[in-house]
């Protein structure tokens, strides 16, 4: 019998949630996703030292101002790691906009343009890039404009139906609804343990997937942030799943049979009228889990971006 990972690939496109090139080679995913935390982790891998030095040299060539050099080096390093990953995966790389721009539509658009330009200067077409943005109202509005320009986006830190609906209505290419972080919140809030079937994160992604398919939205649903393989197996059939190396290894070493759980709708009905900003903010605010986890996620990505910049500053100043 094929291992569980290979069985899963029959129903779902598998994406590696890592910046570790050796892990990506091992599990042969279609795409890969990165974020500031993963870039920070990858920057500590000795084999990546040349990518860091290249980013430092490039940043120094662009500006004499240290603050600008730090920003440029961070952007260039994220792209350098993306370029290495694109040598391995046949599909796309997701590269994230600075989390500190999560409430700045114009700043997010400008950063996306810069990242795309860096990839294009390295010979990579924008069709192989997904720009990752936090699923704030401003991030969704930025994505709507970028999509109209032909720049595809991956809306991340998505914890609520309101965020998912707004993304679909904006014509976003792909969303990353989080599973494990939703489970974390509910376990802490209720003190209960959940089976994979009852897992609140699994229930959330399933309802989003069903809504998209029932209303004919083309936005890709890519479940993310998993705590165990049970969650992954319950979402077999989801358009894509982005999975970290530890769980990819567990799936590869397992022969648990997989059954497709998520199925496309048999008929499509017209969606409701589009949400207004006021509706979005109210519906999102009504979900304390989503409010807390989005804010926490943005803060934590910003903290890791800051740690990365401390390292880059030391190298730029030496």
UniProtKB/Swiss-Prot annotation:
Q: Which gene encodes it?
A: tal
Matching entries from PANTHER family are given as:
TRANSALDOLASE (PTHR10683:SF18)
Q: Biological process GO terms, please? A: carbohydrate metabolic process; pentose-phosphate shunt
Q: Could you tell me where this protein is found in the cell?
A: Cytoplasm
Indicate yes or no for the key word Amino-acid biosynthesis: no
Coiled-coil spans are none
Q: Which HAMAP family match?
A: Transaldolase_1
Q: What is its EC number?
A: 2.2.1.2
Protein name (Swiss-Prot/TrEMBL): Transaldolase
Which keywords accompany this UniProt record? Cytoplasm, Pentose shunt, Schiff base, Transferase
Task: Return the broad EC class.
Answer: transferase
Q: In which pathway does it act?
A: Carbohydrate degradation; pentose phosphate pathway; D-glyceraldehyde 3-phosphate and beta-D-fructose 6-phosphate from D-ribose 5-phosphate and D-xylulose 5-phosphate (non-oxidative stage): step 2/3
Q: Name one GO molecular function term.
A: transaldolase activity
What chemistry does it catalyse, as a reaction equation? D-sedoheptulose 7-phosphate + D-glyceraldehyde 3-phosphate = D-erythrose 4-phosphate + beta-D-fructose 6-phosphate
Q: Tell me the active site.
A: 132 (schiff-base intermediate with substrate)
**What functional role does this protein have?**
Transaldolase is important for the balance of metabolites in the pentose-phosphate pathway.
Per UniProt, subunit arrangement is: Homodimer.
